[in-house]
A protein has these predicted regions:
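Hydrophobic residues on conserved beta-strands that form the core of alpha/beta folds
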Residues: 41, 136, 150, 238-240
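A broad, structure-centric signal for solvent-exposed, well-ordered loop/edge residues
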Residues: 53, 111-113, 190, 208, ...
Length: 285
């Protein structure tokens, strides 16, 4: 259970723009990380993506032109997560943090361009047995008195000692292949243009190597959105998705989608490795 309730205010500050947040994140210094540091909750007001912004997102990722994909809710939630982690009391540097899990659940249809309020709270987990530190950010979005979606992300903030058990070879899941896509070398920049996430590790080789990667990798939520677009063509509109990011996907790679029709689970495979494990809930009727 989260220990910090969302702040309730009659009015809330506007949600900062993504480029400004990313610039501040480059210089964010960590505070002292105790066993259970208390990080203030945040509340921001923002507007849902308008029809034009959604059209660009949908065209890139394969959704219907007028769709409001559940994955698009992450675009606002990510900004709320970043703004919350920029608190001086957040104990970790943002550079080097790794997005390891995400879940999004839609409670009601989001109206394009409608005013939303985002409330975000933080849980910093105790160190694992290997010394790793994780944090969880939970954002809930409301349209007046109506809750419209919740988005929860888990991040690896500090890597621990190498765990031999977790380093064992991955078993490939016994699911049929039902689709896939070829990533272009410009897809990281294309997704940045529609999402606002200009993290350098997704853009070009020199920038990625500057941050310790051999090659640029695609945004994890780009992979999730591409998978959802293919799954929706088979099972109807998705209203919830939960994923675990297992390995990075380099730009220029081929991604395979494994999924058995009529089941919730899916897997993305790249280069013989499991990249994403997930489950999806489709709208009833």
């Amino acid at each position: 259970m989260f220990q910090i309730p969302p702040v309730q205010t009659p009015t809330a500050p506007p949600l900062p723009a993504a480029p400004a947040l990313l610039l501040r994140a480059l210089f964010k210094r960590g505070a002292q990380a105790g066993a259970a540091p208390q990080v203030p909750a945040t509340v921001f007001d923002c507007t849902a993506p308008n029809a034009a912004a959604l059209g660009r997102y949908n065209a890139l990722l394969g959704f219907a032109p007028d769709a409001m994909p559940v994955s698009a809710h992450y675009l606002l939630a990510q900004r709320a997560h970043l703004a919350t982690m920029l608190s001086p009391r957040f104990p970790f540097r943002l550079l080097g943090m790794v997005h390891v899990e995400n879940s999004i659940a839609e409670h009601a249809m989001v109206v394009p361009g409608r005013l939303l309020r985002l409330a975000t709270r933080v849980q910093v987990e105790a160190p694992t047995r290997t010394g790793a530190r994780f944090c969880v950010l939970e954002t809930t979005a409301s349209d007046g008195a109506r809750s419209v979606f919740a988005c929860t992300s888990r991040y690896l903030a500090l890597a621990g000692r190498r765990d031999a058990a977790r380093s064992a070879p991955q078993a490939m899941p016994a699911l049929p292949e039902c689709g896939g896509w070829q990533l272009g070398h410009g897809d990281g920049r294309a997704y940045a243009r529609v999402s606002g996430d200009w993290n350098p590790i997704h853009l070009a080789g020199p920038a990625a190597r500057l941050f310790g990667l051999r090659a640029p990798i695609i945004h994890g939520m780009h992979s999730v959105a591409k998978a959802l677009a293919l799954l929706e063509a088979q099972g109807g509109r998705a209203t919830a998705v939960a994923v675990r990011f297992r390995s990075p996907v380099p730009l220029g790679s081929r991604v395979r989608l494994l999924h058995a029709p009529g089941t919730p689970d899916f897997v993305l495979v790249c280069g013989g490795k499991v990249a994403v494990e997930g489950s999806v809930v489709f709208a009833q009727g």
